[in-house]
Structure formats: C-alpha cells, structure tokens
A protein has these predicted regions:
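Transmembrane-helix signature of 12-pass secondary carriers
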Residues: 1-306
Length: 306
C-alpha cells in the first residue's frame, strides 16, 4: 500500500533522532579535538622544546587542515557517497590521535594535527548532507543548530578532560591528553555503524532499487521513490561557473563572515589558557579558571539556537 505523503513532511522518527546523534557526535568530536590542544600545549611546549613559531603553527595546524578537508570532503562525498565518507573522519581521529602519543618533534605533531583538521573538514559537508537529505524540512533547522551546540559541548569537555588527565596522568600526561580524542573517535565510529546510504545520492547515480529499499527501511513499507520530491537535474559545474552564476557575492559574504567568526574563536580555545597562565604568573590562579570561556560559549549557543 502506497501513499502520497512526501518524505519532506513525515513526522520525526527514531531513525531521524539517531542520525542527528550520529552526525552531532561528529561535531562534538570536532569541538573536542580542536580545543584539547589549548590545554595540552601547556606541557607540550617544554617537553618538545617548541619555539613560539612552532607553538603557533601547531595550534593553527588543525585550522589549516579544515580548509583542505572541507574541499576534499565536499568533492568526495558527491563522488563516493555519504556513507563512505561518514567513517573517514572517525577513522582519522582514531589513527592520528593515537599517533600523537608517540610524537617526538614539533614537525610530526604539526602533521598529525593537520590530518586531524582534515578529518574535521571532511565531517562538516558529510554530516550536514546526511541530515539535510534525510530529515523532514520542518526539523532541519533545529537539528542542524544542534550541531553547533554540540561543538561547544565538546570544547568544554576537552578542557575538563584535559585538566583531569594532566593532574593524574603522570609526567607524560600531555601525550594521553592528545591521544584521548581516539576514545571518542572510536565511539563515534561504532555509533555510526548501520547508517544507510543517502537515497538521493543513490538516485543521482542511477541506483534506483537500492534507493527504494532504503526509503522503505527508513520511512516504512508504504513509502517509495514516488514519495521523494522531484530533484533538479544535476550538472557538473566548475568553481568558475559557480562564481559567475550569481553566487559569487553570496559565497564571498559567507566566507568572510565565517572567517572573521571562526579564527578569533579558534584562537581563544587554542591560546586562552596559556595567556591566562602567563598573566597570572606569580599570582593566585588555577589552570581551569578560563573554563567558563567554553562553557559560556556553549550556553550562549544553546540559548540562541533553542
């Protein structure tokens, strides 16, 4: 028995909630992996004998990786599918984070942090594509906003976990701090097992039978390809074509806005603790005094997006 209800208008179901957790877990790990360096750097610099130049480069390495990872993730998710790329990020988190435990030089740490950044960059287009293509249209905004909230939650947990590890982890605690992301990355990989491919992507590749099977699995046996909204014919456009098709100014606005927003926030998470300790040198202060920064950011994001 079929119906005429579009999958865009169905109620939020268990699969949608689980998919939000799966994609939101990526944002949580992103916030954790990008912020943990802020507290670990307190011990990393003297242990590896880093200069101010290498401190800054290592702190910025993940941000550089995100730039490249975003392009890579966007291109590969259209070519290879959402599901394949959905597991690349967690895999890189685990491998690169574990490798940081044995790091012996600033150059190697830079490379590993860069690859962690690439993993974060891949996460953004893949996770959002999954949510947009599966969620009902009335629930997309709130669920996508949840990703931002979870990013700040991950950043706050990074400060708490990092402080705990540094206090009780012994002389090489900074290595455990950097490697701790592997635990969350492994959990994220496990949680994402069983995620189906996007039926919209399958349709774009002419794999209609697979797409219909997934639609029935997610929405119920009474749903099929006819319940998907009509998709515009896909065209392969170059970056230059995109810029000259009326989207150039919009892209510039978004790019400039996010650059001016992200870089200062990233700098705060990477250097706030170190600057705080230098400013309070010789005075009474605790390393976790700056913790309200990520916690307040999390609260502010939650309040604005609720």
């Amino acid at each position: 028995m079929s119906n005429t209800i579009s999958v865009e208008d169905v109620p939020l179901n268990r699969f949608h909630r689980l998919l939000t957790v799966r994609s939101g877990g990526g944002s949580f790990v992103d916030g954790y992996v990008l912020s943990i360096i802020g507290i670990a750097m307190m011990k990393v610099s003297p242990a590896l004998g880093l200069s101010a130049f290498w401190e800054g480069l290592i702190a910025a390495s993940a941000l550089i990786g995100i730039f490249f990872g975003g392009f890579i993730g966007g291109a590969l998710t259209d070519r290879l599918g959402r599901r394949v790329l959905y597991f690349v990020g967690p895999t890189l988190f685990v491998v690169c984070s574990l490798a940081q435990y044995w790091v012996q030089s600033g150059e190697v740490l830079f490379a590993l942090r860069f690859m962690n950044g690439v993993a974060v960059g891949i996460e953004y287009p893949v996770a959002t594509a999954f949510l947009v293509e599966f969620l009902p249209k009335k629930n997309r905004g709130p669920c996508l906003a949840t990703l931002t909230i979870l990013w700040f939650a991950g950043a706050a947990v990074a400060y708490l976990a990092g402080e705990a590890i540094l206090n009780f982890g012994g002389p090489d605690a900074w290595r455990l701090t950097l490697a701790s992301t592997a635990v969350i990355g492994a959990l994220l990989f496990i949680v994402r097992l069983g995620t189906p491919e996007s039926p919209r992507w399958l349709l774009s590749k002419g794999r209609h039978a697979e797409a219909e099977a997934i639609i029935r699995r997610v929405y119920g046996p009474e749903f099929g390809l006819d319940n998907l909204p009509v998709q515009a014919e896909s065209k392969n456009l170059s970056f230059a074509n995109l810029l000259h098709s009326g989207y150039g100014k919009r892209m510039a606005f978004v790019a400039i806005f996010w650059t001016c927003s992200v870089i200062p926030v990233f700098a705060v998470y990477a250097f706030a603790l170190r600057c705080w300790m230098r400013c309070t040198s010789g005075a009474t202060g605790h390393p976790m005094d700056p913790l309200p920064l990520p916690c307040c950011s999390w609260w502010a994001a939650s309040s604005r997006l609720a």
